[in-house]
Amino acid sequence: MKPKFETVELLSPTGEVVELKVVKRGLAQARPEPVDRNKPAWIKAPLPTGPRYQALKAMVRELRLHTVCQEALCPNIGECWTHGTLTVMILGDICTRACKFCAVHTGNPKGLVDPEEPRRVAEAIARMGVRYVVLTSVDRDDLPDGGASHFAATIRAIKERAPGVLVEALTPDFQGDLKAVETVLAANPEVYAQNLETVRRLTPKVRDPRAGYEQTLKVLAHAKKVRPDILTKSSLMLGLGETEEEILEAMRDLRAAGVDILTLGQYLRPTPAHLPVARYVPPEDFKRYEAWGYELGFREVFAGPLVRSSYRADRVFLEATQR
């Protein structure tokens, strides 16, 4: 079965309406599987509600921002937004890649970039009054630098408009372009993050072919080599069919790359068309993996069923800086 493309209209910086073909919620699988309604109690999150959540939702819409909280259907959106924190996604909401776990739209943005986005994002952060922001983006393989210069411009705009705000840059792999990595680092984020996502064996099955296990490790190692003063961070999803030996191998590889902070969480299928969950990892197993991480020398490890790379990122950063 071929992917179902939809046509969307975007306004270019020159005011021209551009039509793009996208696959909503990613390519995923051709044959959707039944929804799993027997999820264990430990991974159920409360529905988003409350005045703070509604206020943030309205502000995001008003300022025309994209958040990974919404685009990736994150189960923690209610908790995070109620506490006034969110992960801002820049460079649009159309990704040039099609990872099998991700619900972000897939297509070709044709080089479109909103030059006003850094200013709008900085204004939103200032108005929200947050002290810590996670900045991430879709993959933009259609851009010469993968969007690194836009990423850096947004970090600088935030720091200029809202002095004192701490910024975590959760970047794409820029196709292994180390100059692009250096461009982002030059904007002085407090944390540089790139997610390994899964173990070596499952990477071809889970991630887009343009991503790579070794490529992510290379990016993280280079970031630490160039800017040892900046904390590096990565994340693993569990429950995709990996073994404990493979989890430990991935953790060791991340430590060898100089990664300071590690998060581990349960993979949850965003739609029936995405990769099925192979196993629901119980909380006690996450506790063991967390202990492994500290034994390996990570400065901070945050592991649990609902943990995501940007979940409680401000607290994780604080813990890492105090060790």
UniProtKB/Swiss-Prot annotation:
Pathway: Protein modification; protein lipoylation via endogenous pathway; protein N(6)-(lipoyl)lysine from octanoyl-[acyl-carrier-protein]: step 2/2
Transmembrane feature ranges: none
InterPro entries: Aldolase_TIM, Elp3/MiaA/NifB-like_rSAM, LIAS_N, Lipoyl_synth, rSAM
PANTHER family xrefs: LIPOYL SYNTHASE, LIPOYL SYNTHASE, MITOCHONDRIAL
Name of a matching Pfam family: LIAS_N
Keyword presence, S-adenosyl-L-methionine: yes
Positions bound to [4Fe-4S] cluster 2: 95, 99, 102
Keywords: 4Fe-4S, Cytoplasm, Iron, Iron-sulfur, Metal-binding, S-adenosyl-L-methionine, Transferase
Subcellular locations according to the entry: Cytoplasm
Reactions mediated catalytically: [[Fe-S] cluster scaffold protein carrying a second [4Fe-4S](2+) cluster] + N(6)-octanoyl-L-lysyl-[protein] + 2 oxidized [2Fe-2S]-[ferredoxin] + 2 S-adenosyl-L-methionine + 4 H(+) = [[Fe-S] cluster scaffold protein] + N(6)-[(R)-dihydrolipoyl]-L-lysyl-[protein] + 4 Fe(3+) + 2 hydrogen sulfide + 2 5'-deoxyadenosine + 2 L-methionine + 2 reduced [2Fe-2S]-[ferredoxin]
Ligand binding ([4Fe-4S] cluster 1): 69, 74, 80, 310
Swiss-Prot/TrEMBL cofactor(s): [4Fe-4S] cluster
Cysteine disulfide links: none
Stretches assigned to the Radical SAM core domain: 81-299
Family: Belongs to the radical SAM superfamily. Lipoyl synthase family.
EC number: 2.8.1.8
Source species: Thermus thermophilus (strain ATCC 27634 / DSM 579 / HB8)
UniProt cross-references to NCBIfam families, sorted A to Z: lipA (TIGR00510), PRK05481.1 (NF004019), PRK12928.1 (NF009544)
Top-level taxon of the source organism: Bacteria
Claim: Flavoprotein is one of the keywords in the record: no
Protein's name according to its UniProt entry: Lipoyl synthase
Main subcellular location: cytoplasm
